[in-house]
Amino acid sequence: MFAALLFEGWSNHEVDAAKTRSPCTSPAPDAVAAGNGPVIGINRNRIQTAAMPARTVALTFDGGPDPVWTPRLLDLLRGRRAHATFFLYGAQAARHPDLVRRIRAEGHEIGSNTYTGAVLGEASPARFAAELDLTQAALAGTVNLHTSLLRMPRTTSPDTLCGREWQAARQATARGYVLVTADKAARKPAQGLVRQFSQTETAYQETRKLLGDRGVDRFTTVSDGLGLTPYTPAGAAARWQGTALIWGTALGRAFSHAMTWVLGIAGALGVLRLAGLAFFARAHVRRLERFRPGAPWMREVTEPVTVLVPAYNEEAGIASTVYSLLESTHRDLQIIVIDDGSTDRTAEIAAAIDDPRVEVIRQPNAGKAAALNTGLAQARNAIIVMVDADTVFEPDAVHRLIQPLAHPAVGAVSGNTKVGNRRGLLAKWQHLEYCFGFNLDRRMFEVLECMTTVPGAIGAFRRDALLGVGGISDDTLAEDTDLTMALWRAGWRVLYEESAVAWTEVPTSLRQLWRQRYRWCYGTIQAMGKHRGAVLGVGTAGRFGRRGLTYLALFQVVLPLLAPVIDVYALYGVLFLDPWQSAGVWFAFLAVQLVSAGYALRLDGERRRTLWSMPLQIFVYRQLMYLVVIQSVVALLLGSRLRWQRMKRSGTAAEQIGGPAPYKSVPTR
């Protein structure tokens, strides 16, 4: 399919250097320019020319077949009992084989006008051969013939066979072609002439006028007027090649048309998504100002909190995580570190922290969901905060995170996860993704009441809500997404608290990033399948299903799956369409993304100088994410089971946050 698309693009170059003719540097030979006529052959270096007999006109039509004007010309010729010679583009013949067959069936003659209309004098040797051979293949596949008549594109009268065109003409005649040009306009029909037309409305009107000329006895084909043999039957191999060419052309054309629609729809959806994110982000800001904690009618939540920290081989960052929690302004905490069978010193480091609020539970390795359920069973408080063991909390994060739970309908709250280790290009790209992608999405999800994920790095829950859905399920690899969807289906609302900031460590190598995102994507698609029934639900569950699941399916599965195809078609546009127009569309879309990303960074209180890396992110990072989605979907379709993939921690997030140039930022409204 890709090869067919490339061939379709080559056949339909909008900008093609081989279709532009250079000025002649030497005149046509005298035997051609001042010869007996416009039909030219070369036999053993001897130039022979011929003209139509008196009162005989050979009507010739270049290009096409055109689906609009060729049928009208054929109808006109049939009505006047006239015949003509059609010099066809091979590419058009392959696209419209029925018209080629009609031309032949109605007694008209077919010649070659090359495959794409390339100027043969400007073509490379390979292009020269392809232009002629592919046209013969198209004719063999449609009407089972090999033509010996050739009209070279961008030539009219014999004297236009000058400079490079004459060299190309000699090569063509060496292949057995007879060259057909046209008589000059000053020659009268009664003298006998070859008249040249295109297959257009103008040609139709001029042909109709010429057919009424009383000085002409016969309108016929070039070969009939001169007694030439224009065809030989095509061989079996040529017919097979021609048939394959026609089918390949049809496939490439269908794929090109489909991709035009896909690219248009995907581009429109992308722009609408960006506009929607900006609109709903602003709506979220206004909502925070009116209806969320800080408003006089919302009580302050001061109840004690249990913090669950599941950990597996997290010795690099567990101490920073626990100490950041102990520095919380919300003092009434129960911090439970659940060591899930670590093979390093995670449990020892956590147990060595001398604070009565910290408890360490050891269990055999059973996975993150099991560790969280173990901690939930030991929780003493009605409010549960779940934290990844590589996350560092701001001092006021816990207190801010639990404030939306003042509303009795709220069952869970997502915090604002920020990238702590931002040194390096890969980390900067993920920082942009967290602000521009994840956090803008969460603002929109809250307004639309369809939050899809409370991240494992920072999230608050009602204990009753967790127990009501059976705790944390291990049915999927994205237990946080699975849990969030289950809460919506149970009738709970889920909100986003932007001011509750926690810093997480992101992968610093492509291998680690791939494994992490593969797990996220695989688990998210699993959760979508598990909770697909929410689409048909009512009330809170139904709103979540129809909005949240539809959004995930469209923008996180379908469009990424189409991304490689869209990229191929974008490359097609650069190579075969107007490159300036294609580049203009791409830069316009990039500008929209930069503006949206800048707005997202401003809302999160972040510096906007990171935007310089965004063009590179689009070319490299997003392609990686698209491939992750493709691999996840293929793995699910094949029934593959993916194990939990743990990322090797370095503790650099905590070091960089507390370093000489900390990334402290406060969301703005």
Language-model features, listed with the residues they occupy:
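Active-site beta->alpha N-cap acidic-glycine motif
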Residues: 23-141, 145-146
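Membrane-embedded multi-pass helical conduit in multi-pass membrane proteins
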Residues: 268, 278-299, 551-638
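Cell-envelope/extracellular polymer assembly enzymes that use nucleotide-activated donors
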Residues: 303-306, 334, 467, 482
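A conserved acidic beta->alpha catalytic loop
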Residues: 324, 331, 339-347, 366
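Long helical/loop segments within the catalytic core of UDP-sugar-dependent glycosyltransferases
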Residues: 364-365, 369-377, 381-382, 387, ...
